[in-house]
């Protein structure tokens, strides 16, 4: 309810319906995320199979690009799966939600994935800012403070880090990280522009236009 997603969309639509909606909105291409939302064994969590997203991209390569979700509890098995997704299925980046695992972006369990992203020359995008209570049986702490990207950007200067969801309510921290580090960027998704903090509006209207 908080995300204002209609039931049909939440339960899943066909690729053809998605393309119809994209055309209606004049959207040429989108990312399809093989999201890993929490640990597999919990009923409130789910993993979108890499193969499912890879098949959609195979069918409509000019409309979809694939991002590989990350689960830090998978360890090196997850790192190897990421490599296969990129090398065998053409995934163009990695994606993760820190709060679903209650591990901030600078936690050591994410570092093998960062190293592999550098090796594969792909970016990683991650949610920054607060988390919601998506399921009452699985409340998660908000561990996505943008300041946590500081250590990651210092330790992996070759890694392109993309903070999604603007960083609200710590938007100024996200701006500071993008200003400090040439390899840190902000994505203005999730929140309608009318709700963007004024500091973010000023940032993208001025010295943050290329970040």
Predicted regions located by residue number:
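An N-terminally biased module of ancient metal coordination in phosphate/nucleic-acid-related enzymes
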Residues: 1-35, 40-44
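Alpha-helix capping and helix-coil boundary motifs
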Residues: 2, 10-14, 41-45, 75-77, ...
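Active-site gating/metal-coordination segments in enzymes
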Residues: 28-133, 137-140
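Catalytic pocket-lining loop regions of alpha/beta-barrel enzymes
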Residues: 91-93, 103-211
């Amino acid at each position: 309810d908080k995300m204002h997603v209609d039931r049909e969309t939440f339960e899943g639509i066909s690729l053809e319906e998605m393309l119809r909606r994209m055309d209606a909105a004049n959207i040429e291409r989108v990312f399809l995320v093989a999201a890993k939302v929490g640990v597999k064994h919990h009923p409130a969590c789910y993993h979108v199979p890499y193969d499912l997203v890879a098949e959609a991209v195979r069918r409509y390569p000019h409309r979809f690009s694939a991002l590989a979700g990350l689960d830090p509890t998978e360890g090196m098995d997850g790192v190897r799966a990421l490599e296969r997704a990129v090398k065998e299925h053409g995934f163009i980046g990695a994606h993760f939600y820190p709060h679903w695992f209650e591990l901030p972006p600078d936690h050591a369990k994410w570092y093998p994935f960062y190293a592999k992203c550098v090796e594969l020359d792909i970016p990683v995008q991650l949610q920054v800012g607060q988390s919601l209570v998506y399921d009452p049986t699985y409340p998660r702490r908000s561990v996505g403070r943008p300041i946590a990207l500081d250590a990651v950007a210092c330790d992996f200067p070759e890694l392109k880090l993309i903070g999604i969801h603007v960083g609200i309510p710590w938007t100024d921290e996200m701006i500071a990280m993008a200003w400090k580090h040439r390899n840190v960027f902000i994505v203005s998704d999730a929140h309608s522009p009318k709700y963007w903090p004024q500091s973010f509006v000023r940032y993208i209207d001025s010295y943050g236009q290329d970040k």
